[in-house]
């Protein structure tokens, strides 16, 4: 009987299930979108019960599509939107409030209060993270302080906290197991990434009872088995990682200096730094890449707020293109950008500049500038921003980038990938299987149950669909980068400070 690995990929807008075979190929995919809840400006919530219902539903659907039985699943891997916070009553299994999503800014004011007390330095030293409303800690505190009766229940030991991975595992095991992995724990702003434990001092500062927190385990191990009510048989749950870390693993970035960029709405860059937690001087996050083989490995992470979103803007607001795919055709119809730069600082600019007062600009316009030049400049902006983050990573880590592995929607744009390679001066590799997030969770699960022997075997599965090699002269490259940096300085400090 042929065996497979099931991957549950619980994202920000949809719940998916992908089944993989031994070669790391996709056998079937099932997907369901779920409701986004916006109670106030800047607030974002999800319904944890809807997420669980949809996730269980797509698991059954993926089995049906693949025409395989639950007995053929050797293990289940979970990957999830990170930081999103669920608090539930362990006696009833019911959430006390909606899940507060990573994008939610409701605790920004409280973060400012902590910053005024000088706690940002303590938090960065212990957790590797910036003090920000993005992470789970202040979201948990908000629920305890604002939901009637929540604090009393928590003090009595009746409330549990979990990110989405923990919530799914708890439900899959019918409340038997309350667990998370090192990668998800490292995004809570409560976990000491050097001592590998929940930090007592941070829990005290935020007034969060330790009894709420899950046990932290490696990303690849058998956490428990699914309750028989789910599939009719018990299946080992054996892999767990946050989405960006899972993508790094799925891209087989197993050695220090290997990096991946996910070109989505924004871009997420992660570089493996091995067993060394590198402290960033350039506003990057230090995070846990994976917990496996009795040790943890670390990564530097940089996020670019506006990546593929600039293409959506060209399509929906400026109506310059009908589809995102058309941008490649227009960009290649002109020889160069004609001196035009587009800085997509629509919501400020992230790593390594960190200026929330920057705003979007188009610079270098002349009478000869055409629509094609603006479209090309928009695509080029993704490559320039990636260049800036990767240079910061190299500087922080002292590790030279060897090649960049890519995934996400915009990695299908050949013009962008070639330009990315030219600007970085390194090879850019696009894999055959672009479902790298789900694949990473599958690999973690499969390793724990012996479905794959070791990381070497997995590395052999990784196949290049297309490789892009740098072909631009250094002088031209330097001139373009210089122009980009000049454009960024013009975009900065634009919005009036209150």
From Swiss-Prot:
Gene Ontology biological process: glycerol catabolic process; glycerol metabolic process; glycerol-3-phosphate metabolic process
Pathway: Polyol metabolism; glycerol degradation via glycerol kinase pathway; sn-glycerol 3-phosphate from glycerol: step 1/1
Annotated positions binding ATP: 12-14, 265, 308, 312, 409
Catalytic activity field: glycerol + ATP = sn-glycerol 3-phosphate + ADP + H(+)
SUPFAM superfamilies associated with the record: Actin-like ATPase domain (SSF53067)
Regulation: Activated by phosphorylation and inhibited by fructose 1,6-bisphosphate (FBP).
Keywords for this protein: ATP-binding, Glycerol metabolism, Kinase, Nucleotide-binding, Transferase
UniProt-annotated binding residues for glycerol: 82-83, 134, 243-244
CDD domains, alphabetized: FGGY_EcGK_like
Similarity annotation: Belongs to the FGGY kinase family.
Described purpose of this protein according to its UniProt entry: Key enzyme in the regulation of glycerol uptake and metabolism. Catalyzes the phosphorylation of glycerol to yield sn-glycerol 3-phosphate.
The name this protein goes by in its record: Glycerol kinase
């Amino acid at each position: 009987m042929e065996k497979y690995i099931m991957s549950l990929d619980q994202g920000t807008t949809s719940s998916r299930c992908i089944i993989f075979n031994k070669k790391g190929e996709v056998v079937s995919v099932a997907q369901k979108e779920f409701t986004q809840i916006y109670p106030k400006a800047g607030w974002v919530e999800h319904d944890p019960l809807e997420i669980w219902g949809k996730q269980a539903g797509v698991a059954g659907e993926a089995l049906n599509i693949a025409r395989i039985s639950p007995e053929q699943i050797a293990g289940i891997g979970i990957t999830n939107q990170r930081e999103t916070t669920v608090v539930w009553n362990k006696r009833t299994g019911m959430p006390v409030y909606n899940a507060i999503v990573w994008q939610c800014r409701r605790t920004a004011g409280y973060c400012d209060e902590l910053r005024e007390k000088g706690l940002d330095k303590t938090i960065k030293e212990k957790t590797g993270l910036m003090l920000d409303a993005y992470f789970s800690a202040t979201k948990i505190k908000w629920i305890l302080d604002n939901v009637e009766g929540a604090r009393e229940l928590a003090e009595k030991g009746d409330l549990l906290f979990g990110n989405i991975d923990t919530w799914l595992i708890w439900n899959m095991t019918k409340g038997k197991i309350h667990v998370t992995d090192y990668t998800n724990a490292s995004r809570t702003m409560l976990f000491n990434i050097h001592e590998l434990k929940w930090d007592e001092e941070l829990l005290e500062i935020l007034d969060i009872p330790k009894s709420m927190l899950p046990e932290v385990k490696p990303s690849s191990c058998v956490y428990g088995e699914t309750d028989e009510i789910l599939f009719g048989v018990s299946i080992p749950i054996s892999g767990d990682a946050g989405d960006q870390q899972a993508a790094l693993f799925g891209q087989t970035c197993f050695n220090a200096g290997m990096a991946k960029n996910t070109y989505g709405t924004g871009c997420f860059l992660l570089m493996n730094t091995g067993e060394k937690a590198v402290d960033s001087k350039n506003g990057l996050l230090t995070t846990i890449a994976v917990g496996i083989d009795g040790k943890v490995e670390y990564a530097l992470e940089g996020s670019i707020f506006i990546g593929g979103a600039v293409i959506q803007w060209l399509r929906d607001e400026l109506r310059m293109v009908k589809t995102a795919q058309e941008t490649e055709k227009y960009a290649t119809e002109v020889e160069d950008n004609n001196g035009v730069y587009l800085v997509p600082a629509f919501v400020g600019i992230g790593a390594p500049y960190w200026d929330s007062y920057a705003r979007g600009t188009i610079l270098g316009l002349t009478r000869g500038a055409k629509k094609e030049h603006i479209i090309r400049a928009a695509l080029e902006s993704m490559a320039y921003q990636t260049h800036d983050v990767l240079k910061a990573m190299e500087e922080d880590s002292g590790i030279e980038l060897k090649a960049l592995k890519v995934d996400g929607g915009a990695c299908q744009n050949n013009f962008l990938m070639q330009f990315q390679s030219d600007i970085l001066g390194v090879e850019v590799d696009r894999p055959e299987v672009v479902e790298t997030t789900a694949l990473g969770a599958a690999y973690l699960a499969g390793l724990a149950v012996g479905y794959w022997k070791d990381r070497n075997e997995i590395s052999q599965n990784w196949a290049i669909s297309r490789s892009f090699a740098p072909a631009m002269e250094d002088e031209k490259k330097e001139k373009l980068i210089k122009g980009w940096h000049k454009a960024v300085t013009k975009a900065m400090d634009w919005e009036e400070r209150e």
